């Protein structure tokens, strides 16, 4: 359910959790960023997939989160995506070409279908050995599962 449609108590708790997370991780977070949710959440997601294909496993996605939650930038804007590429010394035109091609569209669609098949209901979610781990506060459980 989109954040604005959640029960007011749930919305209030979400803001409290964001404060806790920011403090625990020492991250600057704008709890109500101007551009959340992004106008087009699919575009930055496709750029993340493209950057992964180019060998940037986490940096592009991490920068997108920083730009959205800390810098209050619209990550569905090509100019902002280009700014992120420049910061990471990535070729924007190359990533853009990859992000907008049919292969990435198919992979993005497959990721969505896989999420539905695995009963993913929110982000962040991780599926390992057919078991779902939901929420940043469950990463320790995922870590334990990975060690087995």
Where are these regions (language model features)?
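C-terminal cap of thioredoxin/glutaredoxin-like
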Residues: 63-148
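Structural alpha/beta surface segment adjacent to cysteine/selenocysteine redox centers
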Residues: 1-68
